[in-house]
Amino acid sequence: MDLLGILSPNAYFCSMAKLINLKIFTHFFRSSAAGGILLLICVLVSLIVANTGLGVHFNDFLGYPLGFEAAGLQLRYPILLWINDGLMAVFFLLVGLEIKREVIEGELSSLRHAALPVLAAVGGVIIPALIYFLFNGQSPDTAKGWGIPMATDIAFALGILSLLGDKVPSGLKIFLAALAIVDDLIAILVIAVFYSSELHFLYLGYAGGIFVLLMVFNRLGVKNLFFYLLPGAVMWYFIHHSGIHATIAGVLTALTLPTNQEDKDSPLEKLEHALARPVNFIIMPVFALANTNIAFESEMLQGLTGNLGLGIILGLVLGKPIGIFVMSWLSVKIRAADLPAQTTWTHVLGLGLLGGIGFTMSIFIALLSFQEQAYQNEAKFAILTASVLAGAAGFILLSSYNKNKQEQ
C-alpha cells in the first residue's frame, strides 16, 4: 500500500469530501422532513415528464403488464395497478400497525388522550365532505368524489411542521401525528364501505377465512412474521378479486399482529420499524411519481372554478382547518380534552391548515372515485393546488405567529 498516496492532500480531501457527503446524506434521510421533500421532488419530476415528449412513453411504461397467469391464477397486471393496489397495500399495512400501536399504548390508548385527535379528525372529515357535497351533490358524475377532501398526507404535513423546528411546541407534532392516524382510519373505513365495486362473496369468504387463521396465530402466540405476511399476501389476492379495494388487506393483516406494552421487540414493533423507511422513501415517492403525471391544458385552470375543483379546493383549504379547529375548540370547551402543553389556538388553526394537504391520499381516493381520465386529471390538479395553498398558509401562519411572540 502506498502510504504517501494515502497521506497526500488530494487523497485526504477526497476522503473527507466522501465522508461529509455521506454524513449529509445520512442526516437528510434521518430528518422528519425528508419524506415530504422526496415526495415533492417526485411530484416535480412527474409533472415535468408528463409535460414533455417523455409523457407518452411513461404512460406506456405504467401500462405494461407484469406477472403471470397459471392454472386459473391471475397475477398479471399493469405496473400502475401493482403500484396503486400492491405497493399501497404495504403502505396501509404500516398505517394499520401505527393505528394498533397508538390504540394499545400511544396517544389513542386512553379516552382523555384520544378525545382531542379523534374529535378533531372527525371534524376535519365531515366539514370538507359537506363542502364538497354542497358543490357536487346534484351531479351524478362527480358526487362520488366526496371522500377526496377528507384525506391528509401525513408525510407532507409533518414534513412542513418539522421545517419549523422548535418554533412550534412538540405537543403540536404529536397532536398532528395522532390526528393523521385517526384520519387514515376513517379513510380506510370510507374506502372499504363506499369505494368497493360489485362484491364477490366467494372471494370474500376465502379472505375472511385467512383473517380468522391470522387471528388464531395471534391467540396461539405465534411471533414469526412469515406466518402473518404470507397468508396476508394471499388475502390480498382474494380481496383484490372480491370487489373491495385490495389495500384493505394490509390493514386487516396489521390488526392481527401480536404486540404488548412490555415487549418492545414484538412482531408489530419489528415490522413497523422495518417498513417505515421503505414506505416513506420508496413506496410513497413511487406512488407520487406514477400518479401525479398531469399533462397541463388550458382547460384545467377553468376547471378550478368548476364544481369539482371548487369542492376539492374549498374542502381542503377551508373545510379541513374549520373542522379541525371547531371540533378541537368544542372538545376543550366541554372539558372532554385538553390542548397539548404550550399549544395555543393559533397553533391549532395552523395545524388545521396543514391537515388540508391532501396530496397522495386525496389522489388515491380520486382514482377510486373516477374512472374517467378527464375527471381524474381535474381532481389531481385541484388537489395539487389546494395542497400548495393549505401548506403555504399553514407554514406562514405558524412561522409568523412564532416570530410575533418572540418580538413581544
UniProtKB/Swiss-Prot annotation:
Cross-referenced HAMAP family: NhaA
Stored Gene3D superfamilies: Na+/H+ antiporter like domain
The organism's place on the tree of life at top rank: Bacteria
Database matches in InterPro entries: Na/H_antiporter_dom_sf, NhaA
Transmembrane segments: 36-56, 79-99, 115-135, 145-165, 174-194, 197-217, 225-245, 281-301, 310-330, 348-368, 381-401
Biological function: Na(+)/H(+) antiporter that extrudes sodium in exchange for external protons.
Keyword Membrane part of the UniProt annotation: yes
Taxonomic source organism: Flavobacterium johnsoniae (strain ATCC 17061 / DSM 2064 / JCM 8514 / BCRC 14874 / CCUG 350202 / NBRC 14942 / NCIMB 11054 / UW101) (Cytophaga johnsonae)
UniProt record, GO biological process: regulation of pH
Membrane topology: Multi-pass membrane protein
Family, as annotated: Belongs to the NhaA Na(+)/H(+) (TC 2.A.33) antiporter family.
GO cellular component assignments: plasma membrane
Catalysis: reaction(s): Na(+)(in) + 2 H(+)(out) = Na(+)(out) + 2 H(+)(in)
Gene Ontology molecular functions: sodium:proton antiporter activity
Keyword terms: Antiport, Cell inner membrane, Cell membrane, Ion transport, Membrane, Sodium, Sodium transport, Transmembrane, Transmembrane helix, Transport
Localization annotation: Cell inner membrane
Presence of the UniProt keyword Transmembrane in the record: yes
Protein name, per record: Na(+)/H(+) antiporter NhaA 2
